[in-house]
A protein has these predicted regions:
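Beta-strand-rich interaction surfaces with strong enrichment in secreted/lumenal proteins
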Residues: 75-79
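Residue-level marker for the onset of beta-strands and adjacent loop->beta junctions
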Residues: 16, 74, 84-86
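Short beta-strand and strand-turn-strand segments in soluble, beta-rich domains
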Residues: 68-74
Length: 104
């Protein structure tokens, strides 16, 4: 059996538009705009939805450990830059961190 993520989708986040519409995506390449925006994720499709976020080489952005506002339960706030990655799973209520690689 092969586990495969959907084709990568490139997204830019800004301080004015920090929300990422996850939809049925499972692999996002995200880049900031120089303001280090704090990302907000929309809900997952169903329980168990996996989401891999890869930091595009370029300007950083922050994943915030805040279930109420950002729908993310992380080990702490994570600055994504370089080629960092973050793997999340949708619990039905929030995105929960599985792993994080700081690749810079």
């Amino acid at each position: 059996m092969l586990l495969s993520l959907a084709p990568r989708k490139s997204i830019q986040v800004t301080k004015a538009k920090p929300t990422i519409i996850v939809g049925d995506n499972s692999y996002l390449s995200v880049r900031g705009d120089g303001t280090n925006p704090k990302v907000i994720l929309t809900k997952g499709r169903e329980n168990g939805h996996l989401l891999l976020i890869e930091s595009a080489l370029g300007l950083p952005f922050t994943m915030v450990d805040n279930v109420a506002t950002h729908r993310t339960e992380l080990s702490g706030n994570i600055t994504m830059k370089g080629a960092s990655t973050l793997l999340l799973i949708w619990s039905g209520l929030r995105w929960v961190q599985i792993s994080h690689s700081k690749n810079f």
